[in-house]
């Protein structure tokens, strides 16, 4: 029987693999080479073609996850490592670069849900954090 460390290590390896894929292929993932329009050679104006440097380690990801108590940086909800193996799960952890012009460095990343990371990626305003906090506060007060 595998010990707990062996079992959870696969989750960290998957998250690390996702970071490396994003640094090479962008958040949209790998593209096929069959059709130039689908291969990433011809991209929309808002899509970056530059690669991002990765200096973080699996150990860094674990440390940040524990510093955030396993919760999404933006939504403060629990993230599920198991959801890393669920295709398109909005609750799976995702590595979010705070400054999208910089690479994946310890001082430039937070762990968030795929849901929040995708939303933040589509919204370029610097007020994302305060707006999310206000939305969550209003949602809580409306439910009381």
Stretches with model-predicted labels:
Residues 52-54, 61-63, 74-111:
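Histidine-centered nuclease catalytic patch
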Residues 105-117, 139-144:
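Short Fe-S-cluster ligation motifs
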Residues 80-81, 109-131:
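Short Cys/His-centered divalent metal-binding micro-motifs
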Residues 4-7, 11-71:
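Short, charged surface segments at domain edges that flank catalytic/cofactor-binding sites
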């Amino acid at each position: 029987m595998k010990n707990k460390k062996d079992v959870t290590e696969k989750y960290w390896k998957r998250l690390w693999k996702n970071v490396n894929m994003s640094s090479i292929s962008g958040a949209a993932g790998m593209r096929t080479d069959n059709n130039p329009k689908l291969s990433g050679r011809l991209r929309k104006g808002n899509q970056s073609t530059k690669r991002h440097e990765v200096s973080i380690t699996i150990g860094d990801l674990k440390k940040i996850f524990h510093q955030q108590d396993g919760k999404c940086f933006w939504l403060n909800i629990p993230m599920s490592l198991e959801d890393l193996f669920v295709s398109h799960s909005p609750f799976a952890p995702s590595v979010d670069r705070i400054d999208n012009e910089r690479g994946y460095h310890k001082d430039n990343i937070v762990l968030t849900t795929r849901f929040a990371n995708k939303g933040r990626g589509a919204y370029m305003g610097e007020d994302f954090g305060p707006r999310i906090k206000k939305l969550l506060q209003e949602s809580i007060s409306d439910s009381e």
